[in-house]
Amino acid sequence: MESQARVKFYCDEARCIDCHGCDVACKEAHHLPVGVNRRRVVTLNEGLVGKEKSLSIACMHCSDAPCAQVCPVDCFYVRADGIVLHDKEKCIGCGYCLYACPFGAPQFPKSGIFGSRGPMDKCTFCAGGPEETHSEKEYKLYGQNRIAEGKVPVCAAMCSTKALLAGDSDSISLIIRERVLKRGSGTASVPYTWSQAYKD
């Protein structure tokens, strides 16, 4: 990916086929422990023929991230491109970020003999963490750093129907607009695209 103003994810529910390729790719690429799902597919109206819609959900890297606002140890930080990351070595596992996140993105692996929470884990937009880029420590704590390699996140790269889009908000917004107009839905549904929802 080239230099962006602000990066975002968008899942086109008209294209998502509930294959779980995105969440499996994420889990495999980052070697996530059992119980930690940085990305998940949710089906709305399940069982209602013709009304089912599936969405791939993860951290949305909010412009004004509520998780960062409630963290008592300030383990969150926002990169210049808008990616919201956290420092696992600062995290105390309190869970405030989970309660604040409208997407349920923060995940807490169990650790210790009594099943206490370990440091929080969440989607990193495949941008690693605060450790040295491509270091063994960064990979162990945060997984692949595809952004440093100029690639899109693995979940979006593996989406066979291109329902899951990742990249700079302007480019994603243009793709969404084109798709909506091609579907014949008109411009009535366009205002909910990233260019309006997330002002830089």
Curated annotation (Swiss-Prot):
Residues noted as binding [4Fe-4S] cluster 3 in the record, renumbered to the chain? C59, C62, C67, C101
Q: Does the keyword Iron apply?
A: yes
What's this protein's function?
This chain is an electron transfer unit containing 18 cysteine residues, 16 of which occur in four clusters.
Q: What is the lineage of its organism?
A: Bacteria, Pseudomonadati, Campylobacterota, Epsilonproteobacteria, Campylobacterales
* Binding-site positions, [4Fe-4S] cluster 1: C16, C19, C22, C159
What this protein is called in its record is Formate dehydrogenase iron-sulfur subunit
Sequence ranges assigned to domain 4Fe-4S ferredoxin-type in this UniProt record? 7-37, 50-81, 82-111
Entry keywords, A to Z: 4Fe-4S, Electron transport, Iron, Iron-sulfur, Metal-binding, Repeat, Transport
Positions with a binding annotation for [4Fe-4S] cluster 4: C71, C91, C94, C97
Q: Which GO terms describe its molecular function?
A: 4 iron, 4 sulfur cluster binding; electron transfer activity; metal ion binding
State its cofactor.
Answer: [4Fe-4S] cluster
